[in-house]
Structures are given as structure tokens and as C-alpha cells.
Swiss-Prot record:
The gene is Tspan11. GO terms for cellular component: plasma membrane. The lineage of its organism: Eukaryota, Metazoa, Chordata, Craniata, Vertebrata. It is found in: Membrane. The keyword Transmembrane applies. This is Tetraspanin-11. It comes from Rattus norvegicus.
Amino acid sequence: MAHCKTEQDDWLLAHLKYLLFIFNFFFWVGGAAVMAVGIWTLVEKSVYLSILASSTFAASAYVLIFVGGLVMTTGFLGFGAIIREQKSCLSTYFCLLLAIFLVELVAGVLAHVYYQRLSDELKRHLHSTLTEHYGQPGAAEITASVDRLQQDFKCCGSNSSADWQHSVYILSQEAIGRQVPDSCCKTVVARCGQRAHPSNIYKVEGGCMAKLEQFLADHLLLMGAVGIGVACLQICGMVLTCCLHRRLQQHFY
């Protein structure tokens, strides 16, 4: 027959439950934040995907959504384990926390590796995309992506506005005398690209390449910051879960 221990043990058990409950709430919020970053990436920045030659950028967003959903699901399970005070549920909760922590660790290493890959990919393909595919039949999505890129980042050309001088579009009759696309203009009006003066178009050192690389670096930093925050919470959660599990073992004997 099980016997309860002293009131002091009851006090410690109650406070451990409260601490773990608070942790689990912030852990769940962290999972929601991770998922939100992934969804934001797909919804707001998916226009740039056609510029890239691979699905690396999109894959990172789907990974964030998956991990965020897994964290939120684990959070719900954690609430149930804490309320029911079942050691088996706490053990399962601990294993899930550990598994997610290991997944985040691997994802962090892969993010660092694939960032360099993505950067190299941009350098290889952005220039050819602008000069060979912009404004061409069947490339409406690429054209829209490049226009959005130049307007959002206030840039012109992959490395400079001079890149457009070798563009198939600018050399064609469809350009109607434009020196750069209208999306290079500070104020976009019809045929404003006919005048490639610094007062009229964006002249940015490094062009859109530098701007897009900075965007990717900032995006990776955001993902890293959210990931580190959630990982730190997980370490605290695993410690608290072990303490609560041990206290439950000692509370009844």
C-alpha cells in the first residue's frame, strides 16, 4: 500500500509541477513561434523561390513548420502529463523533449552547411537568371520574382545595374529602349527604365546579390535565435521533468 510522505514533500511536489507547467507554456509558445516563422517564410518570401535553382530555401521553411507543430503537440502532451502526475507520461514527455532537442541540434548544423550552399547557388544562378530568363516567354514567374526582388531590396542587377546591358530582354525589341527594367526605378512608372541615372534607378554596391545574401543571413539568424531559445527551454524542461519524476517516485512508496 502506498503511503504519502510529509507536507514538505507535498510542497516541493506542488512547486515542481507549477515550474514545469510554466516551462511547458513557454515551450508551447516557442513552438508556435517556430511554426509562425516557417509559415511567414512561405507566404511572404516564396516569391523569391523561382530565382533559386533548388528547393533548399523552401525546405527550411517546411522543416520549421514540422518542428513547430511537433513542439506544440509535445507541449499539449506535457500539460496532460503534469496534471495527471503519471510517471509513464512524464517519461514519454522527457523522451520527446530529448528527441526534439537532438533534431534541433542536427538542423542547426545543416542550416550552417546549407546556408553556404545557398549562397554559392545564388552566385551561380542569379546573374544568369537576370540576363537569360527575365522577360522571356514562359518565364513570367521569374520575371515577377526579379521585379519584386529589385523593388523590395531597392537594388538593380545581380552585382550592379550594368548587368542588364547584357540581358536578352534589354537587347530585345520588347525593352522599347529601356536600359534597365522599370523595377530598377526608385519611382516605378511606364518606361522609367529608359533613363539609367543614379537619381532615377537604384545604384547599390554589390547589387541584389549582396542584398539577397544579407536577407538570407538575417533569416538564418532569426531561425537560429528562435531555435536556441527553444533549445534552452528544453534543457530546463528536461531537468524539471526528471526532478518531478524522481519526486513522484519518492512521494509514494
